[in-house]
Amino acid sequence: MAMNIMIQGTMSNAGKSLLAAGLCRVLKQDGYRVAPFKSQNMALNSFITKDGGEMGRAQVVQAEAAGIEPDTRMNPILLKPTTDVGSQVIVNGQVRGNMQAMEYFRRKRGYIPAVLEAYNSLASEYDVIVIEGAGSPAEINLKQDDIVNMGLAKLVDAPVLLVGDIDRGGVFAQLYGTVALLEEDERRRIKGVVVNKFRGDRAILEPGLKTLEQLCGIPVAGVIPYAHVDIDDEDSLTERFDRSKDRKLLDIAVIRVPRISNFTDFSPFEHYGNVSLRYVDQVSDLHQPDMILLPGTKSTIADLRWLRQSGLEAAILKAADAGTLVFGICGGYQMLGRTVSDPEQVEAAGVTEINGLGLLEMDTEFRGEKVQTQTRGVFCGVEGMLSGLNGLAYEGYEIHMGRSQQQMPALTGSRNVYGSYVHGIFDAPGITDTILKALCARKGVSFDALATFDAYGYKERQYDLLADVVRGGLDMSFVYRVLRREV
């Protein structure tokens, strides 16, 4: 069986996901076959594996860092929020239905066999399993029947590194308070604490670290500096929204619908030096972008109503009429059609049909069975502004409940309005270049002013940079002793 180590945090956004990804990369560089694991993940950003299973993107990032194919065994339970108190429950990559929070809380212990089967299967194939917890292990109201933090650590006998975020302040209270709220057997599982996102001179931190070690009786395993590493992170949505809204040579506006999902679809546009990618949720911020992107959503009908009530629908229609490129992905694509119907009440009770924006000649109907598949092909028959895509290869994945009358498998539309069910459609080489060239031609500017972008090479360099940061801040000799059970 594989060696294992678990990354737990003092809170959400402490940096567990990226630290786990960085550790996966370091171990890969050191010659180990390593796989990530998170028993239960809650996220709207998901991914479809080659065999058609759905999993959280955090473990996809970690798998990529480890140099292996994403596998639903790495995330056997995925919860996709549908309301403030309910989620779609996905087990081993397949939808089990929608549940209210209390119902899931009562039933989650029944998923332990699925969690252990997935974990043991991975552990039989790899040298090391890097496990990520969720939130904090000290959420005393959630400790009963826990299957994602200390409960999981006990099930798979995993040693733990506890991570605290110093960037938001109070890291010593975070770490000490978390340890203090744990049971004695749980405290013994914590082999080291890690201070994450540190800015400044570590020497200033040393007195506090020594006191923390004395108070907790646990060594400090590392201080990870705050690093500007460009890697998709499921907790990074707020940061993306808060980025500078300065407009550059080309201006792309993403409509920030309330239930946005798979926002990482648009990451390729962020890497061009003279392209701004802005998230917009009110008409006054839309201005006159060169391209409008309608993202995926967990609730197409609810977000379509919001789009209408906010005035953004009228603004998008006006922009499209003026020739602005409009592109919808998944739920955003559905919104661009004539109607969206839900006769089986798949999304929510009370609405059976709603008018779309009417920019694409198609209708969408929701059905109970979910489409989840990887897809690839070559663009053909594309007309209008994006005709330059013809002949280019694409690949990605589909996750949707709706069925639409599509003109082509990957892309529907003509003139200046297009839509697709394919998440990741902008990732393949040449696709973003072609779209940006079309925008430049319409605007009368030179594409040479935009730096071309190699998505795969860039991502690999970022994983290596993350590994450098983790290797430099974490005591890896200590980590290896933890893995070998010498601590």
Give the positions of each predicted feature.
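Flexible phosphate-sensing "switch/lid" loops adjacent to ATP/NTP-binding sites
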Residues: 2-320, 325, 342, 368-369, ...
